[in-house]
Amino acid sequence: MQPIRVVLAGATGKVGQVLARALVQEPGFALTGAIARQGGGRNLAELVPLGGRPGPTVHGSLEEFLAAGGEADVLVDFSVAEAGRRTIPAAIEASIAPVVGTTGFQPGETETWAAMCRKRGLGGAFIANYAVGIMLLMRFAEEAHRFFPDVEIIEMHHKTKLDAPSGTALRTKARLERGRGDLAAAEVPVHSVRLPGLVAHQEVIFGGLGQTLTIRHDAPSREAYVPGVLMTCRWVLREKRVAFDLEEVAFPRT
């Protein structure tokens, strides 16, 4: 069986480095390309510790990667929104399925790319958070909201995170607001914290008569995203469908 060929955008970023190490070690995967703003022409292993394994050549853009004869089945994009706006549609046009963890896009952008995927018969994923624990937090919170109408979200991240509120918090908020059925939920407040020493943390706090309930997820290591990304890469190639939530991948509806 041929390995899944991955080109990784944002390969030298904080999450990208973790994913690069995972992809060069994971059976059934081959990291065939790396895209980064700096280090073009160098081997990724010179820029990112890959555990002694060789890496692909770094390119400044997906177009450069393809022009150099690069081939990939999946684009994994954990870059920034500005770069993603160029890389993601280029990948789809090249029949490379996008698995996107980059956030900060304007409303409607991911829907446009999803439509492009469907038109070309490609799978794709535009998911704000690939941590399996966050997926379960949303699932549990949606269930709890049936019994606790009063709820607020607190999301806490490292000081350099660009978007606030986080894409994950906004996704959680949207699920809670639409998940109450006929109970007409009010808008769910979201509070953002950006401090040194934090990595990625989210709490959903419910209040009721004489009690509170807190559902919390902590990701002190960016390795938390690896299992979800690998699972989604397999899914987009197998199912050739588009997902906006990791739950759609982990718990597919027939």
Curated annotation (Swiss-Prot):
It is an enzyme of class 1 (oxidoreductase). The active site is at residues 157, 161. GO terms for molecular function: 4-hydroxy-tetrahydrodipicolinate reductase; NAD binding; NADP binding; oxidoreductase activity, acting on CH or CH2 groups, NAD or NADP as acceptor. Its EC number is 1.17.1.8. The gene is dapB. This is 4-hydroxy-tetrahydrodipicolinate reductase. It comes from Symbiobacterium thermophilum (strain DSM 24528 / JCM 14929 / IAM 14863 / T). The lineage of its organism: Bacteria, Bacillati, Bacillota, Clostridia, Eubacteriales. It is found in: Cytoplasm. (S)-2,3,4,5-tetrahydrodipicolinate binds at residues 158, 167-168. Its main location: cytoplasm. One of its GO terms (biological process) is diaminopimelate biosynthetic process. Disulfide bonds: none annotated. Pathway: Amino-acid biosynthesis; L-lysine biosynthesis via DAP pathway; (S)-tetrahydrodipicolinate from L-aspartate: step 4/4. HAMAP family: DapB.
